[in-house]
């Protein structure tokens, strides 16, 4: 097993991409620490992992709170002894017409999609530095490397807060890699393309969701959405010792997007 006896924290892992990552980790021998604000989703994820014979524990944590994160990491280390892996997956998106995007949209999206990534890494790395070992994987997006297609009433500018945050995560990954590398900590990033998740139609007009799916699918060379296990496999590689000489890198898991700019 590639992650035998590892303690792996995955934020936003009660559903969607995060849940698939946590389940993959547990399949490979890790104890998956399910971090989510939705207690029902969190409990369901833990139960599903345990039903497959894996190990998991759930924590309800608001990852936008620096003090809450520090307390959570301290409690986890006190219970489990260490933190080996952190996957910064928690995120939100808000799509509004370009002219309707307001300060509250920027604050909400950057608060979770960027600031929380930094503070999670900061809190976890305190313990990883003591261990002289750790793996941090940040989840960015293909929108961090290119623009979103214009669909219906929503132009590229509708995703400005989300895309900007995800682009910043790629740069933050390099900064953290340089900062933490001397302490034996690898920091890498995965930029997913189009996957069908609960965020697919988030904040979109229901009539535009089908067109959104078509346009995003056509933008990929493989002409299909990604499968959750395909993303989880990429994250698993970066979380395992198979990637021990890789740090500061971003792997695009996007089916070959042709609309990058």
Ranges and model annotations:
Residues 220-231, 242:
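A conserved structural motif in NAD(P)-dependent oxidoreductases
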Residues 146, 197, 236, 247-261:
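Short C-terminal tail/terminal secondary-structure segment
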Residues 97-98, 105-110, 150, 158, ...:
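Substrate-binding pocket helix/loop in short-chain dehydrogenase/reductase
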Residues 39-40, 59-71, 103, 229-230:
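The beta1-alpha1 cofactor-binding region of Rossmann-like NAD(H)/NADP(H)-dependent oxidoreductases
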